[in-house]
UniProtKB/Swiss-Prot annotation:
One of its GO terms (cellular component) is ribonucleoprotein complex. One of its GO terms (biological process) is translation. Keywords: Ribonucleoprotein, Ribosomal protein. This is Large ribosomal subunit protein eL39. It comes from the Archaea. The keyword Ribonucleoprotein applies. InterPro entries: Ribosomal_eL39, Ribosomal_eL39_dom_sf. Belongs to the eukaryotic ribosomal protein eL39 family. It comes from Desulfurococcus amylolyticus (strain DSM 18924 / JCM 16383 / VKM B-2413 / 1221n) (Desulfurococcus kamchatkensis). NCBIfam families: PRK01242.1. One of its GO terms (molecular function) is structural constituent of ribosome.
Length: 52
């Protein structure tokens, strides 16, 4: 990827980076382990982002 990135592309990459994290501990505690992990986790090698 080029070094110079447009601001819109940089914002989309930052949003994807922030959303790619595990769920907080209090969520699994509040739901009594019905929600164990986030299903939207993405690995940089396995699946690529679209429209960026």
């Amino acid at each position: 990827m080029a070094r110079f990135k447009h601001v819109a592309r940089k914002l989309r990459l930052a949003a994807a980076l922030k959303s790619n994290r595990a769920i907080p501990i209090w969520v699994s505690a509040k739901t009594r382990l019905r929600v164990r992990r986030g299903f939207s986790l993405r690995n940089w090698r396995r699946s690529k982002l679209k429209n960026i």
